[in-house]
Amino acid sequence: MNKKQKVILSLLQEIDEICRRNKIEYYLSPRLTLCAVEGHPFPQNPMFGVVLMKTADMERFRLAVDEDPREKRALESMKSHKWFSGFYLRYTNTDTLCLNLDNTRDYAFPGIGVNIFPLRTPVASVKAERRLSRDENAWTELCHINYADRNFRSRVNRTIMRLQCMITGRQGQAAHLYDRLVRACQQPGANKYILKRRKQTTIFPAEIFAESKRVTLEGAELQVPAKTAEYLTISYGKNYKDAKEPRYVTPIALVVSARVSYTQFWKESGNFEKYCKERMKNARKLARSRRHKDYFNECWDYVEFCGERLNLSVSYEKQKDYIKNLYKNEDYMTLERVFRPYFKMMQKSLQKNGLFAEDEEIFDIYVDVLEKTGKTVQRSKIGTLI
């Protein structure tokens, strides 16, 4: 194991010690559980240090650490840091460095750490679930504005969140949202738990976490769900034993060190705040240019599509008399062969909620041929748009 992996393992051991002392249940993430159970090597990715706790236990852990803080350790959450982007905790070794230069505000203590994600219960009502999900997504997008959705609803939700931040203060709003999530996501008697990550949501039956057991990971005794097979099957599928860790390459924007602390890095970087502002400004420009590129590509694809339609319509215009003659003689087998390119273009047009009907006579013949040859699926789709 390298020094960064050893730091993560030591943090996991400390979390285990705190949980055992305060009788708090926790579970290694599916990735770490797989490493422990199947003997796979410890992950290279410094962001793979993850444990799971039920929402109530996660809050108890936060309070326990706040009451008895440790030297060179920090526990961050939305309760303590106004730019913390999600509903989870991060237990950090402050004598190390793990900094994403594109998101320098994410953590107040950007060292190597272990993320503690909550196992949420479903919210009591659908209405409350929608409202809470809306506010949580708006907060996350506000923290990572360069990667936020640009649709109208997301913009409105972010605007409402900004107004709330102006009224209560950003830190007050973050803490208030955290408290709401803690209250809403620990309903008694739940039959399932939801693990919500930034890009993935996984649902586990409640019985998986009914009991726990001890396993050994790189010589350290840690805790996992007793039903490890079911736990890993839900996460990786039936062939979880064959799951391999993808080859890890440190991203260009990520600075990681187990020897240098983030405070030393800041000092040696000179005016770090100015550097961060410039980098964020450049990231914003890059995100904007990517959106423009995506829009341009979409427009160009549509231009090419319209060109294909036009060329095909000219081709069928030249065959119009031939098609009418085949239709008059009820030669539907030949017509089906003639209309194959027309069928493909109609499929593309229907995907864009449109019709390929440049010539009304040919279109009417085509629709009748669909009925006669039994292609009722496309015929019904056309019928809904006529």
What are these regions (language model features)?
Residues 299-303, 334-345, 376-386:
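Alpha-helical repeat scaffolds
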Residues 1-20, 62-134, 138-235, 242-281:
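Conserved catalytic core of two-metal-ion nucleotidyltransferases
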Residues 306, 346-350:
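Alpha-helical junction/boundary sensor with strong preference for TPR arrays
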Residues 16-49, 53-59, 207:
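Active-site nucleotide-donor binding segment shared across nucleotidyl transfer reactions
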